[in-house]
Amino acid sequence: MDAISDPLIRDCVVMAGAQVGKTEMLLNVIGFHVGQDPAPMLVVQPTLEMAQSFSKDRLAPMLRDTPNLKGKVKDPRARDANNTTTHKVFPGGHVSLVGSNSPSGLASRPIRIVLCDEVDRYPASAGSEGDPVQLARKRSATFWNRKIVMVSTPTNKGASRIENAFEESDKRFYYVPCPDCHHEQKLKWSNVQWEKDKPETACYVCEECGSAWDDPKRYRAVRLGKWKATDEFKGVAGFHISGIYSSWTPLADAVRDFLSAKKMPETLRVWTNVYLAETWEDQGERVDDYAVAERA
């Protein structure tokens, strides 16, 4: 949220795994602009059906249950609401929700805040109009304080919108301190270790001192972490975070998923994209990239 509200940052790019708060981040941005900094907003989902589902299942409950937002957006069923599932008006602004495959939804009124969710699932072109992200971006051209937010799990190397955007950013990674030696480090799958055929023994091993972190220890370390940029800032803030940081997924479950996924390239590809938040390269020896030291 600090990056979203920073006037020096033009674009925010979030390349992330599952269960690390991507959707909550988007909801927080919407809530902030509904309650504190009213603006016209556009939320782009891969399809209209996904936009409707996001509105009903996530956005509407937040607007209804958050005290500071309650009442700012009228119930669509009210006679004077002027609201629908995919278009909600509030004092000083509105939020529209569209599918990336809809040229008309991407080419109407000016928008200051553009939120593009799961951009790697967008089609190459919205009808015959061109790239959906660029169409949405053009909607914000008249605002000096515009903000473009792109969020996604990645897909294939060379064809991933989110990876390409991340490569143009300042490439921020989340560094956590070891609870024992305090060395700050990115969490890597190569440092997840377990006894052979015993996923329940999985732990994270500090790259500096070798101490083993169980899940509670890992959760505490993550809470003390901080983002660090690894490249020059040129107006685009990029964030990468994998499922290893998630407090919702025990490492034992992650190891079980990995052991099951590595049996076939297609399932390993999905695991790589969704858990590690990394793009997939079609290589016959891809499984070798995940060689993990197993402790006896």
Identify the role of each PLM range.
Residues 1-296:
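Phosphate/NTP-binding elements of NTP-utilizing enzymes
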